[in-house]
């Protein structure tokens, strides 16, 4: 795996629906509408499914149901599906997908023979025309005297005229940039914006897009600083730690700091909005937390806010191992209770770390500085997912920062069933045909993989890894066949192996089912 791929995975990723979980086909296809005449866009309409890599197989799907499939003699980059005049019989939400052919003669699993679904394209056959999509790029905030941002508007129909409106202001704004089906509007002032489009000068504007809110921020918002690998591991031969700083937009310069002191460490930038630092642990002269910040092109006199701090810990294992004890006893603990893990050393003024055994790594899950000879770590509202082997370690708070070996492991056993997450439906009533049904799964611990499961089915319908305690899950293209009861669950990301219970179900009812 490349370093850039590792960074992108570290900052969060989302897997597609169940029929594409094992696919790595590049990019999803594009579906666009090509009317015979923009004066009467619904009189004779053709849908074009275009893909980056040539293929022989194209499939058109309407309202979540398969509609048409073509198999060609030779691979092409696009295929045209003629709908003709739009009536109640062929109006709806369309998507397409394309067949994937491996570069060598291998047998793919059936579900891996397709690309992801294309963008959704709404065909109504009436006016006003369906709304475009809109979003802020690269961020949804501006600073006084700072760089503007764009509002990007898109509709899957070429040749239209885009208009932007600001709430409370008469008149419209024309695009500053436009390419294929997307238009960009430069935004210098905060406010609520929406865009629409015209197919011809005498036509009616389309339905407006969803509101895009641009806020004013006093300073550039902070970047995120994270440890490569998600968890901190300690072993005596370790000499370097890797930190990644990511800004919310492209930056001219980054700084890695301890307190107010800028560290003289040259970073490597895989992208314009990120820098990776290799920190030599042997060259550090203090244990202060690390932060990072950035500044923008043309605004080099203004630094962003600092990131949240990241603490490091390391050990040469030259000092005696501490002793770890549990209060109450580590066996037969009750769910929902609190357990105290006491780490005791032979000297005072140390930094202590609580470690948990993964597979195969022993990782640091908490750190505490102590002026005495011990530190007390607390695990609150414990459940079966906290069961496992724990140990502790310490290091001196002054150079040369010698440290101990890990204590003898202590096993925690928590009784009871695994905790259940909570699944929340982010819509009301019935789900319209061809639209998305978006859920939020609320768990108990960060760094997990969450799954959307349906009653009676073994394969998840959606998966998402998250560094927080919740994640968005969805049915991306709802048809009548999606009516049913859905739940969520989560499993630990490596190196841990716990699994939650199943949430209470949420019923999905689809219009027309």
UniProtKB/Swiss-Prot annotation:
Q: Is Membrane one of the keywords UniProt gives this record?
A: no
One of this protein's Pfam families, by short name? Ig_2
Tissue expression per record: Isoform 1 is expressed in normal liver. Isoform 2 is expressed in the regenerating liver after partial hepatectomy and at very low levels in the normal lung, brain and testis.
In terms of SMART domains, this protein maps to: IG (SM00409)
Q: Where does the record say carbohydrate is attached?
A: 44, 89, 192, 369, 381, 389, 485
How would you summarize the oligomeric state and partners of this protein? Interacts with CRISP3.
User: What are the alphabetically sorted keywords of the record?
Assistant: Disulfide bond, Glycoprotein, Immunoglobulin domain, Repeat, Secreted, Signal
User: Where would you find this protein in the cell?
Assistant: Secreted
Phylogenetic placement of the source organism: Eukaryota, Metazoa, Chordata, Craniata, Vertebrata
Q: Which GO BP terms apply? A: growth hormone receptor signaling pathway; immune response-regulating signaling pathway
User: What gene does this protein come from?
Assistant: A1bg
Please provide, in alphabetical order, the Gene Ontology terms of the cellular component aspect for this entry: extracellular region; plasma membrane
The record's disulfide annotation reads 49-96, 153-195, 245-292, 343-392, 441-488
Gene3D superfamilies from the UniProt entry: Immunoglobulins (2.60.40.10)
Protein's name according to its UniProt entry? Alpha-1B-glycoprotein
Q: Which domain of life is it from?
A: Eukaryota
Signal peptide feature range:
1-20
Q: Which ranges carry the Ig-like V-type domain?
A: 22-126, 127-219, 220-312, 313-415, 416-513
Q: What is its main location?
A: secreted
């Amino acid at each position: 795996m490349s370093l850039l791929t590792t960074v992108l995975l570290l900052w969060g990723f989302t897997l597609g629906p169940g029929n594409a979980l094992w696919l790595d086909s590049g990019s999803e296809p594009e579906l666009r509408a090509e009317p015979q005449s923009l004066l009467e866009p619904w009189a004779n309409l053709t849908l074009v499914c275009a893909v980056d890599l040539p293929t022989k197989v194209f499939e058109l799907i309407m309202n979540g149901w398969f509609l048409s499939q073509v198999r060609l003699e030779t691979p092409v980059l696009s295929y045209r599906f003629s709908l003709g005049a739009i009536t109640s019989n062929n109006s709806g939400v369309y998507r397409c997908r394309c067949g994937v052919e491996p570069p060598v003669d291998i047998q793919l699993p059936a579900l891996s023979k397709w690309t992801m679904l294309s963008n959704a394209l709404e065909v109504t056959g009436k006016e006003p025309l369906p709304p475009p999509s809109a979003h802020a790029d690269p961020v949804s905030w501006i600073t006084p005297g700072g760089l503007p941002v764009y509002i990007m508007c898109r509709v899957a129909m070429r040749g239209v005229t885009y208009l932007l409106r600001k709430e409370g202001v008469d008149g419209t704004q024309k695009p500053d940039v436009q390419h294929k089906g997307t238009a960009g509007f430069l935004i210098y002032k905060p406010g609520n914006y929406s865009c629409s489009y015209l197919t011809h000068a005498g036509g009616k504007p389309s339905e407006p897009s969803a509101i895009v809110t641009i806020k004013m921020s006093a300073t550039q918002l902070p970047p995120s600083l994270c440890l490569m690998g998600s968890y901190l591991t300690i072993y005596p031969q370790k000499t370097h730690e890797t930190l990644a700083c990511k800004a919310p937009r492209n930056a001219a310069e980054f700084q890695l700091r301890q307190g107010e002191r800028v560290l003289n460490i040259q970073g490597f930038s895989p992208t314009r909005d990120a820098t990776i630092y290799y920190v030599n642990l042997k060259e550090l002269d203090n244990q202060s937390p690390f932060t990072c910040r950035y500044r923008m092109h043309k605004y080099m006199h203004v630094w962003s806010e600092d990131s949240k701090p990241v603490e490091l810990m390391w050990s040469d294992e030259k000092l005696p191992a501490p002793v770890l004890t549990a209060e109450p006893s580590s066996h037969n603990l009750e769910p929902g209770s609190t357990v105290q893990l006491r780490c005791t050393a032979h000297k005072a003024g140390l930094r202590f770390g609580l470690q948990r055994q993964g597979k195969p790594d022993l990782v640091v899950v908490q750190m505490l500085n102590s002026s005495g000879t011990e530190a007390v770590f607390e695990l609150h509202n414990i459940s079966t997912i906290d069961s496992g082997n724990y140990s502790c370690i310490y290091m001196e708070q002054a150079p040369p920062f010698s440290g101990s070996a890990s204590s003898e492991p202590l096993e925690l056993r928590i009784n009871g069933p695994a905790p259940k997450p909570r699944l929340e439906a982010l819509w009301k009533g019935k789900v319209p045909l061809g639209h998305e049904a978006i859920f939020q799964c609320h768990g108990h611990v960060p760094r997990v993989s969450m799954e959307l499961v349906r009653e009676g089915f073994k394969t998840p319908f959606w998966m998402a890894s998250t560094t927080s305690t919740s994640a968005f899950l969805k049915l991306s293209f709802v048809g009548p066949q999606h009516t049913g009861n859905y739940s969520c669950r989560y499993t630990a990301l490596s190196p841990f192996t716990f699994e939650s219970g199943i949430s209470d179900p949420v019923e999905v009812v689809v219009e027309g089912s």
